């Protein structure tokens, strides 16, 4: 009972309509730069690229997959650092250097025999709009560009790279009644 109260307090700001849309979701897809990261790119003197990721975002991926969700990324930039992170998280799929994300998503859904209504997508910028306006549940981080925030179903209070992916995952699990049992089962294992 205590866990339920904690989860309810944690997600109390999420509108009920968002939870209703989340009930039909089977796939969580994210952009990377500006969602899994804060959008910054660091380079060293040799041109090596560095990005900072939030470990809380990564931790939930395997639990989503165990709960039956597919998890993936479609990103506009091609970057070995991003590919490495997607592999490390064991995403079911990840596409890099994609300029037409809606076309790529449509091709992907056709092979998976899924519909747009079964997709939750996290994006933060202009390149994400064609997807965000057509999927079953669209989510943006707090620091997404204003016209993206205006177009999505839910704007998280969290910024890119600060746990927005984790919140979206928790939201999906909670909408399907799986977050509280997950927390309680893990708490019992550690007791």
Question: Model-flagged regions — what are they?
Answer:
Residues 24-26, 69, 117-118:
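Short coil/turn segments at beta-strand junctions that form active-site/ligand-binding loops
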Residues 61-85, 95, 132:
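Substrate-recognition element of Asp-dependent hydrolases with the DxDx(T/V) motif
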Residues 17-18, 23, 35, 39-40, ...:
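Tandem CBS (Cystathionine beta-synthase) repeat/Bateman regulatory domains
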Residues 32, 76, 98, 142-145:
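Short secondary-structure boundary segments
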Residues 1-30, 178-191:
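Non-catalytic pre-domain segments flanking phosphatase-related domains
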Residues 50-51, 87-89, 93-95, 102-191:
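Mg2+-dependent phosphoryl-transfer enzymes with acidic/Ser/Thr/Gly-rich catalytic loops
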Residues 50-67, 102-106:
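Short, acidic loop-to-helix structural element flanking the phosphoryl-transfer center
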Residues 23-41, 132, 165:
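Asp-based phosphoryl-transfer active-site loop
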């Amino acid at each position: 009972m205590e866990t339920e109260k904690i989860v309810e307090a944690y997600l109390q700001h999420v509108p009920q309509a968002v939870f209703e849309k989340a009930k039909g979701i089977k796939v969580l897809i994210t952009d990377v730069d500006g969602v899994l990261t804060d959008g910054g790119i660091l380079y060293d003197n040799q041109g090596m690229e560095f990005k900072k990721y939030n470990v809380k975002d990564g931790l939930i991926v395997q639990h989503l997959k165990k709960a039956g969700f597919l998890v993936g990324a479609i990103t506009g930039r091609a970057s070995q650092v991003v590919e490495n992170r997607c592999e490390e998280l064991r995403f079911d799929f990840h596409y890099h250097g994609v300029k037409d994300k809606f076309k790529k998503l449509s091709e992907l859904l056709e092979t998976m025999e899924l519909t747009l209504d079964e997709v939750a997508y996290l994006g933060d910028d202009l390149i994400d709009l064609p997807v965000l306006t057509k999927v079953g549940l669209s989510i943006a981080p707090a620091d997404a560009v204003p016209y993206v925030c205006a177009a999505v179903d839910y704007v998280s209070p969290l910024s890119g790279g600060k746990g927005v992916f984790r919140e979206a995952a928790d939201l999906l699990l909670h909408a399907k009644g799986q977050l509280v049992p997950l927390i309680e089962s893990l708490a019992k294992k550690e007791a």
